[in-house]
Amino acid sequence: MSLDNVVEDIRDEARARAEDIRQDGQEQADEIVAEAEADAEELLESRKADVEQQLEREREQALSSAKLEAKQARLSARRDVLQRVREQVERELAELEGDRREELTRSLLDAAAVEFEDADEVSVYGRADDEELLSSILEDYDGYEFAGERDCLGGVVVEGSNSRVRVNNTFDSVLDTVWEDNLKEVSARLFDDQ
């Protein structure tokens, strides 16, 4: 075997080995590229899912916020309506006249008088505009006298001279009690709540 043949065999072997190395390198490169593409696709899908979840959370938050604002607006409107109804009732109580006003005032005084059966002197306070009415009613009660004005819609505040008892039977206090006790029913009637 000649030297040229040996050189040629070595070259062929080197070329074959180089081709094997190149093929191995290409296969490894193809695997790396395929893995990178798969990783990139997986990362892209993961990011898309994250973005979708974030968008869904933001949509839900926006919807919840809008619902809350709408509910607050409804509640505010209801409070305004209830306040106007309350003010209308107060106006009507303040404007009561004649027999109806006397009947209610006498009834409130009778209810308060139970607390002062042992009192010698009883002071009765009321609305300035009701002084004449109260003085007339008090003629039927021994030891009771009109003692002055109270800022109220009507009715009476009664105090005994020998006790620390004070009974507030004004239209205002009765309205407060009735309003609180019946607010749910009033609201249901006004707003058709179930």
Swiss-Prot record:
- Entry keyword set: ATP synthesis, Cell membrane, Hydrogen ion transport, Ion transport, Membrane, Transport
Question: Would the keyword Cell membrane turn up in this protein's UniProt record?
Answer: yes
Q: Name one Pfam family in it.
A: vATP-synt_E
Looking up SUPFAM superfamilies in the UniProt record yields:
V-type ATPase subunit E-like
Which Gene Ontology MF annotations are present? ATP binding; proton-transporting ATP synthase activity, rotational mechanism; proton-transporting ATPase activity, rotational mechanism
Q: Name one GO cellular component term.
A: proton-transporting two-sector ATPase complex, catalytic domain
- Please state where this protein is localized: Cell membrane
- Top-level taxonomic group: Archaea
Instruction: Look up the record and give one Gene Ontology term from the biological process aspect.
Output: proton motive force-driven plasma membrane ATP synthesis
Per the record, the major location class is: membrane
User: How does the protein's chain sit in the membrane according to the entry?
Assistant: Peripheral membrane protein
Q: How does it assemble?
A: Has multiple subunits with at least A(3), B(3), C, D, E, F, H, I and proteolipid K(x).
In terms of NCBIfam families, this protein maps to: PRK02292.1
So what family is this one in?
Belongs to the V-ATPase E subunit family.
> What does this protein's UniProt record list under function?
Component of the A-type ATP synthase that produces ATP from ADP in the presence of a proton gradient across the membrane.
Protein name in UniProt: A-type ATP synthase subunit E
